[in-house]
Amino acid sequence: MYEVKLDAFNGPLDLLLHLIQKYEIDIYDIPMKSLTEQYMQYVHAMKQLEINVASEYLVMASELLMIKSKLLLPQHDVDDNLEEDPREDLVGRLIEYQNYKEYTQLLTEKKEEREHYFTKHPTDLSHLEKNVTWDECQTLDLTDLIVAYQRVKSRLALNKPKTVEIIKESFTIQQATEKVTTQLRHHTSFNFFSLFTFSEPIEQVVTHFLAILEMSKSGVINIEQVRSFDDIRIIRGVNFNIG
């Protein structure tokens, strides 16, 4: 015999909450008869499979049966001092556990999100400090003060850790190389800017650029540019395989 958690539930409250959500039960008005029956079915199933049911599940089973029996008592047999709903304590614990699960899930998601970020330590800018004498300050006007304020803001921003999100590469250099090769099999030359639209991410533009640099170094293509900032012309190189 061995001990397991029922269907991977983390204790009896987790099992009860699962049943409440599965059968869409109002947590503030629990029908004890049906909920107890569903709960006991889980416990009996484990016993039939000769699985050693943890004692906490059996304690909860006893509590459910007790609450159920109190609700079944005729009204005139109920103790006059018993004013509270016998389900009240159980409902309170279930709500508290439900909140705990929701917060745990939220923290888990935040932890996973944070793992995609790396923090850079502030840059040391102490070497940029400049001592200003009082005589120099006397010549300042409002415009100088505004400029100084903007400079202070910029320096403070540099002292803050810079957080950069690392995005998984979705367009590889290999894909860009194949795209260039396909173009050159149909045309002896073409313009670099025709490879993409300017609505595409900058990462994809950079990937294309790295691809043509690699192809140029290996002699697969030649690249030409008439003037600075003009479009780059991509031409078949001596090692280009037209296939």
UniProtKB/Swiss-Prot annotation:
GO terms for biological process: cell division; chromosome segregation; DNA replication. Keywords: Cell cycle, Cell division, Chromosome partition, Cytoplasm. Pfam families: SMC_ScpA. The keyword Cell cycle applies. One of its GO terms (cellular component) is cytoplasm. It is found in: Cytoplasm. Component of a cohesin-like complex composed of ScpA, ScpB and the Smc homodimer, in which ScpA and ScpB bind to the head domain of Smc. The presence of the three proteins is required for the association of the complex with DNA. Participates in chromosomal partition during cell division. May act via the formation of a condensin-like complex containing Smc and ScpB that pull DNA away from mid-cell into both cell halves. Belongs to the ScpA family. This is Segregation and condensation protein A. The lineage of its organism: Bacteria, Bacillati, Bacillota, Bacilli, Bacillales. The gene is scpA.
